[in-house]
From Swiss-Prot:
Subunit composition and interactions: Monomer.
Required cofactor names: Zn(2+)
Keyword vocabulary terms for this entry: ATP-binding, Ligase, Metal-binding, Nucleotide-binding, Zinc
HAMAP family cross-referenced by the UniProt entry: MshC
Pfam families the record matches: tRNA-synt_1e (PF01406)
Motif ('HIGH' region) on chain: 45-55
Intervals of motif 'KMSKS' region: 289-293
The protein's name: L-cysteine:1D-myo-inositol 2-amino-2-deoxy-alpha-D-glucopyranoside ligase
Highest taxon above the source species: Bacteria
Record's catalysed reaction(s): 1D-myo-inositol 2-amino-2-deoxy-alpha-D-glucopyranoside + L-cysteine + ATP = 1D-myo-inositol 2-(L-cysteinylamino)-2-deoxy-alpha-D-glucopyranoside + AMP + diphosphate + H(+)
Binding site for L-cysteinyl-5'-AMP: C43, G44, I45, T46, T58, N81, V82, T83, W227, G249, N250, D251, I283
NCBIfam families: mycothiol_MshC
Organism this protein belongs to: Salinispora arenicola (strain CNS-205)
Length: 412
């Protein structure tokens, strides 16, 4: 599957420092220390209702990770998937009387357009679940042979992962069993499925049904993969046995990232699967959770159609810390547009305060668990000073613009 078009990222003088990131598994901030190349896997969209602001906020978060890594002198191999076959996609297509493949292709294309507009650095590998099915089926068979997976004895042939085979199950989410049992059905799990060894066992392979798409599965028979194993296999195949960052929204902490880690670790015999499990907060609207069921999603494409500057959208989403659940409202966008206008005027000023001093502090803020609110405040201070004629560094405005572009992804 093709990714989207990238843009040139300006080079800055010197190098940034190591990136400190909050790890959901360790419940604390720790240094991200890739050796030479940073590897990152981010769970992408299920292609319907794209791209809402929750998607955008998550993608901006991991775009910042890429930018800080690159500024520190690292190469980056970034993989993102598209869950282009899943129950919610099929349900939406059936509801709207549309071919699921047409729906998936259209929404994926729209997502790419939005990523270009938001100046998200594209992944090195943008991979659909469908194109990965042969590899996924092979890995599921491996789990069956190693007795870490089993078939339900009800005639369907469905295959489930046995969580008792994963002794560290629960380390990524830090949830107790009762919490898991509560969340599991809310996020795609089926704890009441008869024949499972444990209510929390996740689906690995759904055997073919007469009214559903299916693909050859070798020894599994025809069918389609479960959600969690898709991401585990794509990441393993493209990034290796251990990765530096596994990322997504905080609604993926459990069961998705917990189960993906368990699958990967059983397949490789190595733990932890990721050095950092990094999760972005949810975006609400006017104090309410933004969700498909409430019909209150705000879409990047609609904002663009209303001629909202995508850089203002990006700034608005970065005005809150990536880990916090936060609310979207019109005032945020108005404030972001005013900030963008002010920065653009400052970047066109004849001179300003030392941008190298600004750059050092700017890098420090972003390296501290992606403190974008702190970075925005620093940029505001520099811009305000430049606009009132403080400082005589004639090269400073251009370096300010390059720094904001390279590290925040905001083009002035």
């Amino acid at each position: 599957m093709d990714s989207w078009a990238g843009h040139e990222v300006p080079r800055l003088p010197g190098r940034g420092g190591p990136l400190m990131l909050f790890d959901s598994a360790r419940q604390g901030v720790a240094a991200s220390t890739p050796t030479g190349t940073g590897t990152m896997y981010v769970c992408g969209i299920t292609p319907y209702d794209a791209t809402h602001l929750g998607h955008a906020a998550t993608m901006i978060t991991f775009d910042l990770v890429q930018r800080v890594w690159r500024d520190a002198g690292l190469d980056v191999t970034y993989v993102q998937n598209v869950t282009d076959i899943d129950d919610p996609l099929l349900e939406r297509a059936a509801r709207d009387g549309e071919d699921w493949k047409v729906l998936a292709m259209r929404e994926t294309a729209l997502f790419r357009e939005d990523m270009v507009a938001l100046r998200i650095i594209p992944p090195a590998h943008y991979v659909g679940a469908v194109e990965s099915i042969p590899d996924i089926a092979e890995r599921v068979l491996t789990l069956v042979k190693e007795e870490a997976a089993y078939r339900i004895d009800d005639g369907t042939g469905d295959v489930y992962f046995d969580i008792s085979a994963a002794p560290r199950f629960g380390y990524e989410s830090n949830l107790g069993r009762e919490q898991m049992l509560k969340i599991f059905p809310e996020r795609g799990g089926d704890p009441d499925r008869a024949g499972k060894r444990d209510p929390l066992d996740p689906l690995l392979w759904r055997s073919a049904r007469a009214d559903e798409p299916s693909w050859p599965g070798g020894g599994l028979g025809p069918g389609r993969p479960g959600w969690h194993i898709e991401c585990a296999v794509i990441a393993l195949n493209l990034l290796g046995h251990r990765i530096d960052v596994q990322g997504g929204g905080n609604d993926l902490i459990f069961p998705h990232h917990e189960c993906s880690a368990a699958h990967a670790e059983l397949l490789t015999g190595q733990s932890p699967f990721a050095q950092h499990y990094v999760h972005a907060g949810m975006i609400g609207l006017a104090g309410e959770k933004m969700s498909k069921s409430r019909g209150n999603l705000v879409f990047v494409s609609r904002l663009r159609a209303d001629r909202v500057d995508p850089m203002a959208v990006r700034l608005a989403l970065m005005s809150g810390h990536y880990r916090s659940d936060r609310s979207w409202n019109d005032d945020l966008l108005v404030t972001a547009q005013k900030r963008l206008d002010r920065w653009r005027r400052a970047a066109a000023a004849p001179s300003g305060p030392s941008a190298r001093t600004f750059l050092a502090a700017f890098r420090e803020r972003l390296a501290d668990d992606l403190d974008s609110p702190g970075a925005l405040t620093l940029a505001d201070s520099w811009a305000d000073a430049a606009l009132v004629g403080t400082g005589d560094d004639q090269a400073a405005p251009a370096l300010f613009a390059r720094a904001v572009d390279a590290l925040l992804g905001v083009r002035l």
